[in-house]
Amino acid sequence: GIKEMLCNMACAQTVCKKSGGPLCDTCQAACKALG
């Protein structure tokens, strides 16, 4: 849903940009849980 999309964008601009890897995956997995 839209929440998941916005959450993924936030992940991409923060966690994924800074470190990536497992932390990025975890962030996006949390987004998926939001649906």
From Swiss-Prot:
Its main location: secreted. Oxidation likely reduces antimicrobial activity against Gram-positive bacteria and Gram-negative bacteria. It is found in: Secreted. The keyword Lyase does not apply. Keywords: Amidation, Antimicrobial, Disulfide bond, Oxidation, Secreted. The modification Glycine amide is found at residue 35. Transmembrane segments: none annotated. The modification Methionine sulfoxide is found at residues 5, 9. The keyword Transmembrane helix does not apply. Displays cytotoxic effects on human melanoma cancer cell line A2058 (IC(50)=4.1 uM) and the human fibroblast cell line MRC-5 (IC(50)=7.5 uM). This is Turgencin-B. It comes from Synoicum turgens.
